[in-house]
Amino acid sequence: MLDTRNVYETHIGTFKNSISPKTTNFREFPKWVKKLKSKIDTDQKVAMFCTGGIRCEKASSLMKKEGFKNVYQLKGGILNYFADVNENDSMWEGECFVFDDRVSLDHNLAKGSYDLCHGCRMPINSSDKKSKQYVLSLIHISEPTRRSY
């Protein structure tokens, strides 16, 4: 199973034993496919998935253009899988990143436990917020101003 999503999405959750191209954005995917082509037989079956199915359409088209003959995708993506498969029977581990204010969804399609860091715009959880590197506010007040409060 090929996870066509970006690496920060896969850190939140993915299918058991899936393969990630570890891309930071989808523009890197074509280069990864070219490398993959030199490593596996293009007749090998490739099943892929993404959040809602749109990236899989692009990814499968690209892979077919590169000569992969047996390319399949999860219809409707992860979100459709969550809706169709009982959590107890699921092969999914973790939550699913979404590109809206919810940041992540759990298997019941409810808002997950992740927030978006205001500094780096990456998903963060409660453990990340306890890190010394995490700063809640990006408003940096100079020392003289801070003393006047």
Regions found by a protein language model. Give the residues of each.
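Short, non-ligating residues that shape and space the ligands of small metal-coordination modules
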Residues: 126-127, 147
